[in-house]
């Protein structure tokens, strides 16, 4: 396993935890929204571990504010973090994946790709792009042995999820515990999403590509 992130401290800790559990893991520092940085990191990973056969595009952030208060700079920044990162990482990894005979890619989208939320126009737009990026890659590379799917979490108890709840509450959007319980039963946990990602990357999902797996306990089914 290779972890590619700009947060070296947390990345190294995660790699160390994987190794402590008996796995083989390395960390490669990179800003995944920067082409040169991504190229260098992927070359390092391939040099140390060989061809990449599984890729999880998970970098993401959020902007929460009324649309008319958002700026072009915020739009471009969020597009870079949430969408350009997937483009760059996938483009850098695909050559070695194709050389290895195929592989699997999972992109983190969100319920926000299909369920709009007030004050999240920028975020919702990026997640809609993630949705279609995964589908388009799946269609183009199916015959070459590469699968690509999107995983779409609901509200998850992570630093990102907690920031979203705080930000929406600030603007009067009801994301209280009772409301979230009504929408999706409970707050999701990181393991709920991790299990779905591992499944989509595994051979158990060998006939699944170009789809979106909603990990939201029924949020989008209502």
Where are these regions (language model features)?
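Alpha-helical segment proximal to the catalytic Tyr-Lys
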Residues: 95, 139-143, 206
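Substrate-binding pocket helix/loop in short-chain dehydrogenase/reductase
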Residues: 66-67, 74-76, 178
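C-terminal substrate-recognition "lid" of short-chain dehydrogenase/reductases
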Residues: 87, 186-215, 220
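Residue(s) in the substrate-gating loop at a strand-loop-helix junction
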Residues: 110
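Short, small/polar-rich loop/turn modules that mediate ligand/substrate recognition or access, typified
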Residues: 56, 142, 147, 208-210
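Active-site helix of classical SDR
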Residues: 90, 126, 134
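Active-site loop immediately N-terminal to the catalytic Tyr-X3-Lys motif
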Residues: 68, 115-121, 143-144, 185, ...
């Amino acid at each position: 396993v290779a972890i590619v992130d700009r947060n070296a401290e947390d990345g190294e800790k995660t790699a160390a935890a994987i190794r402590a559990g008996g796995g083989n893991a390395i960390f490669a520092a990179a800003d995944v929204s920067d082409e040169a940085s991504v190229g260098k990191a992927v070359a390092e990973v391939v040099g140390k571990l060989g061809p990449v056969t599984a890729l999880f595009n998970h970098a993401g952030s959020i902007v929460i504010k009324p649309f008319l208060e958002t700026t072009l700079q915020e739009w471009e920044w969020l597009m870079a973090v949430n969408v350009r990162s997937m483009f760059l990482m996938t483009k850098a990894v695909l050559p070695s994946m194709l050389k290895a005979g195929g592989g699997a890619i999972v992109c983190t989208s969100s319920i926000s790709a299909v369920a709009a939320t007030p004050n999240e126009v920028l975020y919702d737009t990026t997640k809609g792009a993630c949705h279609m990026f995964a589908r388009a890659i799946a269609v183009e590379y199916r015959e070459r042995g590469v699968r690509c799917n999107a995983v779409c979490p609901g509200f998850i108890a992570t630093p990102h999820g907690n920031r979203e709840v705080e930000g929406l509450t600030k603007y009067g959007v009801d994301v209280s515990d009772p409301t979230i319980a009504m929408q999706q039963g409970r707050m999701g946990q990181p393991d709920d999403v991790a299990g779905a990602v591992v499944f989509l990357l595994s051979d158990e999902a060998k006939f699944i590509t170009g789809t979106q797996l909603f990990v939201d306990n029924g949020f989008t089914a209502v």
